[in-house]
Amino acid sequence: GGRGIDVGTDHGYLPVALVQSGAALSMLATDVRPGPLDSARRCVRENGLEGQIETRLADGLDGLPLGGITDIIIAGMGGQLIAEILSRRVLELGGVNLLLQPMTQAPYLRQWLCGNGFAIRQERCAVAAGKAYAVIQAAFTGEKIPCPPLYALVGRSPEDEGEDAGTYLETLLGREEKRLKGLCASASPNPAGIAEAEMLAAWLREILAARDQKKGE
């Protein structure tokens, strides 16, 4: 357990759970909105964790002390917003473990991470309320690396052997097939866009087929 920051903590359930389980020694729980932050304070107080969890009104990581921080969690928002939050403190994130859970725009976030000196260490997928999401573990290395279309789309999620990862990949395939259908039906078709969607859908089918084969062995 280390010292973490939960950005956009909402009701404060996550930092409370992390401290109670011993996964974190202490947490800084932040939110940009006073209402949710009041709820988080109440949750912390009801669990008797005021000594280990500090709550603070903040926009992303702006104005927060990052010295001694081991982990930063940014979950439950769009990939573009997560990238914007990180972009304002990039050079101070060396040695910090990032756990990022984009609700939307995951490909954008992966592209941004690769292009701004972050390495994606691993991904784990989760299904909640019938929707599948990826949780991205990343770290700042300073080395910018290429992010081809397939990697932007799936990241390291195929390495996750859990059932939720299969659901996540099937969701991505469904979206690509829907996108391809729309592109083909367009009054002014985009050949490059169609070719890319066809390629991504084919790759996703291959990944899913390989997973099924491995399961059957």
Regions found by a protein language model. Name each.
Residues 1-10:
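Conserved class I S-adenosyl-L-methionine
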Residues 10, 77-80:
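Short glycine-rich anion-binding loops that position phosphate/pyrophosphate groups of nucleotides
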Residues 11-24:
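Conserved SAM-binding loop of SAM-dependent methyltransferases across substrates and taxa
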Residues 22-23, 45-51, 91-93:
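Short helix-capping segments at alpha-helix termini
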Residues 26-31:
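Conserved SAM-binding motif I beta-strand of class I
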Residues 62-63, 68, 80-217:
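Class I S-adenosyl-L-methionine
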Residues 69-76:
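Short SAM/SAH-binding signature in class I
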